[in-house]
Amino acid sequence: MGHIPQTDCQARPAMPVSLRNKTRWPATMAMIAFCILLSACRNTDPDAFTRVQAWPLPTTSTPSAQPDLVVTPSDELLLSWVEPTETQHRLQLSRFQPVDATPRWAPTRTVASGKGWFLNWADTPHVYALEDGSLWAHWLRSTGPGRMDYGIDLVRSGDGGKSWSEPHMVNLGNSLGDHGFVTFWQQANDQLGMAWLDSRQRAVMGSMAKGESHQHGAGDHDHHGKDAMMLRGALFNASVRQQGEWPLDASTCDCCPTSSAVTDRGTVVVYRGRSANEIRDTRLVRFDGKTWTSPRDVHADSWQIAGCPVNGPVVVAKGNTLWVVWYTEADGAPELRAARSQDAGDTFAAPVTLAKGPQVLGRASLALADEHVLVAWLEQSQDDSQRLVLGRYDHALQNPRQVEIAQLATRGRASGMPRLRVANGSAWLVWTDVQSGQPIVRGASIH
């Protein structure tokens, strides 16, 4: 089997280390079922979300990478990942039903396969489920001669993933430049909202220099103003036809993932902004269904950095309460911060430090439970290996408790972006590790 190609931002994986307390599939699934039933019977549990179990995934073949994990309106879980074939790549999808007495995976389905995909450790495909039962997915496809010319292919399934629409290129006209770092939300029962980072204005500037290649890496992002990446948003109907598109911010960080959540006052999108003097702090915009607010800072960290840190913010919401988690080095050291808003993002309380020090890698994922806020992030060990950590907090971001989820064999950026979700009273977490020198997606359930 072929390997998943890596961009120049990636580091090759090292020798594998298995998840701690690895068990056989039947025993593990039985334990998961027991913990689910147990958690349903408890109103308050001082040890909630500290009991870690291996979660067997359908990603049994290697290599597999770039996982995404989402909760459906029926409280099921959708897991997607990318794996290679002999000549191309395919986006795989499976559904997990944690609500049953015996949790199980549905048969894996292929969303799409093809050549010429753009695969990157941070800019990964996403899946989503709307209340009308439809499933949506996207991946990145090369669109031009340059390595960084790629666009967003969007598809929809109305039959549970058995069949999919023809891919729709979100950036119309197959415009050159890079377009990615997508976030999805439900705008209506049958309407998908999405936001992404878009380089059309930078591509126009670049085209003025004939023959100049359009490249970017972790330290190459030194543009701003009309030569900067921008944030755009759009809505799509059940026919995968665009029903509006908006420029949301004309100057953003180049390759930090975006995130979104729905409040009672509309959808909030968070992302890393970029000022003319290279201040790259977390910003927020909100959409009420008709208009978008102007960008505003979640907090004025005043982190000045000439290159993109590839470390975007994440957000969850309930009612008009928002929680945002982000990475910064504004005080001279790697730090993971969180802040809460109780007015749908108009104002935020002072940020809380979740983790700080040279070991903090960030790449946070965020989920909300009935009584807790859960945050997963990566840290680096002294031997350059990595570990995956889960932090549990109350809704005021107080009373912290941390638990180690796994020791990873992979190093650098090959570990990708962890994905954390809460469904049926338990937390579910997936990430990329290595096995026999190849990337593989692993999982854990936390009860």
Regions found by a protein language model. Give the residues of each.
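Bacterial N-terminal signal peptides that target proteins for export
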Residues: 7-12, 16-30
